[in-house]
């Protein structure tokens, strides 16, 4: 649960901190930042600030983006909402952009931002070119699927799942083809 949640960008080469009222509003919780593969957009999750902790199960995060020019140290002036949750009655977290820049993998769950504790948490994929959801339901189970990451060439993902017992988390691998279709996931081998 975030009582305060803002985003800043640290340029370690120039030793400067980039921030904006767009990313540190008292009216919203901003979290889970990630850059587009070309570094020209910052994707993140944002939810309207509400009374916490008494209303924590009503916090729902949208997926947003902001243009950035890291060479000049300039952040855009307008936040774009990529996926709105008001029609989904869900919360979104962990946006990760594929190395090709075409796909955004993220987690959808009922509320909040710590999805591993939500049995309903599922992985979802959004095609940033066509601006449409891609069906990757083959990756999901009755238990939580949560944190995930792309391989460096963008044809594989690794993700956390509690599908075996619902009590502990294991890592699964799945192939993603050039159209964003997911193959059947398999348990990450633990021994040779």
Predicted stretch roles:
Residues 146-147, 154:
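C-terminal, well-structured subdomains that either form a transmembrane helix-short loop-helix hairpin
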Residues 1-7, 23-29, 45-67, 83-91, ...:
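A flexible loop/linker signature enriched in serine peptidases of the S9 family
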Residues 32-34, 94-96, 147-149:
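Conserved beta-strand position repeated once per blade in WD40 beta-propeller domains
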Residues 98-99, 125:
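Predominantly soluble domains enriched in secretory-pathway, periplasmic, or organellar proteins
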Residues 156-160, 174-177:
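Short basic/hydrophobic patches in alpha-helices and adjacent helix-turn junctions
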Residues 39-43, 104, 157-158:
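Hydrophobic beta-strand positions that form the internal "hydrophobic ladder"
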Residues 37-38, 99-100, 152-153:
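Residue-level detector of Asp-centered blade-edge/turn motifs that repeat once per structural unit
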Residues 8-29, 67-93, 125-144, 175-192:
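Multi-bladed beta-propeller domains
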């Amino acid at each position: 649960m975030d009582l305060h949640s803002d985003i800043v960008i640290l340029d370690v080469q120039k030793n400067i901190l980039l921030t904006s009222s767009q990313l540190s509003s008292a009216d919203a919780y901003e979290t889970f930042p990630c850059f587009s593969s070309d570094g020209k957009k910052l994707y993140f999750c944002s939810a309207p600030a509400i009374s916490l902790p008494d209303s924590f199960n009503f916090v729902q995060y949208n997926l947003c983006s902001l243009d950035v020019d890291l060479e000049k140290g300039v952040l855009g002036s307008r936040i774009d909402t990529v996926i709105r949750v008001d029609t989904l009655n869900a919360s979104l977290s962990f946006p990760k952009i594929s190395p090709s820049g075409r796909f955004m993998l993220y987690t959808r769950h009922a509320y909040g931002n710590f999805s591993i504790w939500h049995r309903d948490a599922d992985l979802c994929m959004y095609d940033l070119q066509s601006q449409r959801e891609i069906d990757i339901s083959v990756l999901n189970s009755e238990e939580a699927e949560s944190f995930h990451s792309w391989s460096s060439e963008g044809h594989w993902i690794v993700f956390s799942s509690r599908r075996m017992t619902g009590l502990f988390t294991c890592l699964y691998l799945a192939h993603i083809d050039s159209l964003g279709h997911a193959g059947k996931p398999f348990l990450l081998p633990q021994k040779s």
